[in-house]
A protein has these predicted regions:
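Short hydrophobic/aromatic beta-strand element in the GNAT-like acyltransferase core
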Residues: 44, 53, 70, 101-102, ...
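Helix N-cap motif at beta-to-alpha junctions
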Residues: 14, 74-77
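Short acidic/glycine-enriched loop/turn segments that link adjacent beta-strands
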Residues: 38-43, 63-65, 96-100
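Core segments of cupin and vicinal oxygen chelate
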Residues: 9-52
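Hydrophobic side chains in well-ordered alpha-helices
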Residues: 20, 79-82
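Vicinal oxygen chelate
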Residues: 1-3, 86-120
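A short linear hydrophobic-aromatic micro-motif
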Residues: 32-34, 55-56, 89-92
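N-terminal beta-strand motif that seeds the catalytic metal site of vicinal oxygen chelate
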Residues: 1-21, 67-69, 120
Length: 120
């Protein structure tokens, strides 16, 4: 089983899209990336820095959930089995996005999204 960085999901509670662009595009100099049409309904802007994509959530009503790092794997079932076998809780109860995925936290509370490789 292999894993690779996929994206980082960052939080911008209460920020407008213009506020988010002002920092990530204008100040940091990241390129705004187009998210897939299937995600158009989600209040998230995408920015790229080389091969890393930042997903920045900005709903005006606040954020539901936590920020996370996402890792893509060539064997989602093996990854899930490894975490469970090592005693880590796997959360499959996530908002449906049209592809299988799960979340897991490290012992210090940092959250990781584990998803199949090949997704935008």
């Amino acid at each position: 089983m292999t894993v690779a960085a996929h994206h980082l999901y960052l939080l911008a509670p209460g920020a407008s899209p213009d506020d988010v662009r002002r920092f990530y595009r204008d100040a940091l100099g990241l390129a705004e990336a187009q998210k897939p049409a299937s995600l158009a309904h989600i209040s998230v802007l995408w920015f790229s820095a080389g091969s890393i994509v930042f997903h920045v959530g900005h709903p005006a009503e606040g954020i539901v959930g936590d920020g996370h790092a996402a890792l893509a794997t060539d064997d989602l079932d093996a990854a899930r089995a490894r975490f469970i076998g090592m005693g880590y809780a796997v959360d499959d109860n996530v908002i449906p996005m049209g592809y299988p995925r799960f979340y897991v936290r490290d012992p210090w509370g940092n959250q990781f999204e584990i998803l199949p490789e090949g997704l935008p």
